[in-house]
From Swiss-Prot:
Gene3D superfamilies: Triphosphoribosyl-dephospho-CoA protein (1.10.4200.10). It comes from Shigella boydii serotype 18 (strain CDC 3083-94 / BS512). This is Probable 2-(5''-triphosphoribosyl)-3'-dephosphocoenzyme-A synthase. Keywords: ATP-binding, Nucleotide-binding, Transferase. One of its GO terms (biological process) is prosthetic group biosynthetic process. Belongs to the CitG/MdcB family. HAMAP family: CitG. Its EC number is 2.4.2.52. One of its GO terms (molecular function) is triphosphoribosyl-dephospho-CoA synthase activity. NCBIfam families: citrate_citG, PRK10096.1.
């Protein structure tokens, strides 16, 4: 694959360490897509509310992206002496090249564009922290990623022009900041909610898949998911949030019998053409950070 230039600075990071974190990113993507049943999302059972993609597309996409994750880590390390606000500019060509390989692997299907952005940021943050010999925890990784994105929401969502992007339109209509806003804030939905929730369930001895499904419900209940809003408007988003919250209030996903509730929720999401892709992206980050 053709690699864009990154930096003339050298990194002291061992290749084995870089590959270890890249492997975790790949495993995080596979863990999310294979998790079943997921309301409105592609999984091992069906294609959710998607008519243009299948499970195999996500497997091919994750493999293509895995080859680029070391580059994000390396750039984070090589740019460690740069001001954090300058890092995002250098990450963009790597992200675009990674995106190109994703589209080639899936014959044009957008499977993981959001994950390229979020995992790319976290991998770059990991590289920076390792290079600077600073503490590497979920919180420091996310706060470092946030420092890369300072001002991003203002620059890309609050700009008024005649050709509004989907993200700008949702921001102006519903004040949803999506993936950009979550990144700039340091992923609070993950750090303050999803990750502690998931780890608590694991500590209680809950099956890891059930714990992840329950954590997905939590994210769906609290996330202003632009994927859902773009398909179903504000009404669709509020409906999905209410349904997820209701399931959590009834006890969530604790046993195999509880999966029937998710299957019904899945059918309703498919009927309404709603897919909580933004929450799925955050679930990928939750699992990834839980391994650090």
């Amino acid at each position: 694959m053709s690699m864009p230039a990154t930096s003339t600075k050298t990194t002291k990071l061992a290749t084995s360490l870089i590959d270890e974190y890249a492997l975790l990113g790949w495993r995080a993507m596979l863990t999310e897509v294979n998790l079943s049943p997921k309301p409105g999302l592609v999984d091992r059972i069906n294609c959710g509310a998607h008519k243009d993609m299948a499970l195999e597309d996500f497997h091919r996409s994750a493999l293509a992206i895995q080859g680029w994750l070391p580059r994000f880590i390396e750039f984070g390390a090589c740019s460690a002496e740069m001001a954090p606000e300058a890092v995002l500019h250098g990450l963009r060509p790597i992200g675009m090249a990674c995106e190109g390989d994703m589209f080639r692997a899936t014959a044009g299907v957008n499977t993981h564009k959001g994950s390229i952005f979020s995992l790319g940021l976290l991998c770059a943050a990991i590289g920076r922290l390792l290079q600077l010999n600073q503490s590497l925890t979920p919180t420091t990784v996310c706060s470092t990623a946030a420092s890369f994105c300072r001002g991003l929401t203002d620059r890309e969502l609050r700009t008024n022009n005649s050709q509004l992007t989907a993200g700008q339109r949702l921001y102006q209509q519903l004040a949803l900041t999506g993936a950009r806003g979550e990144a700039e804030a340091g992923y609070p939905l993950v750090i303050n909610h999803a990750l502690p929730h998931y780890l608590t369930l694991l500590d209680q001895g809950l099956d890891p898949e059930l714990a992840l499904l329950d954590t997905l419900l939590l994210l769906m209940a609290i996330n202003g998911d632009t994927n859902v809003a773009s398909r179903g408007g504000e009404g669709g988003l509020r409906w999905l949030q209410r349904e997820a919250q209701t399931l959590l209030q009834k006890g969530g996903i604790r046993t195999l019998a509880d999966l029937d509730y998710l299957r019904q929720f899945d059918r309703e999401c498919i009927e309404r053409n709603l897919s909580p892709g933004g929450s799925a992206d955050l679930l990928i980050l939750t699992w990834f950070l839980a391994q650090i």
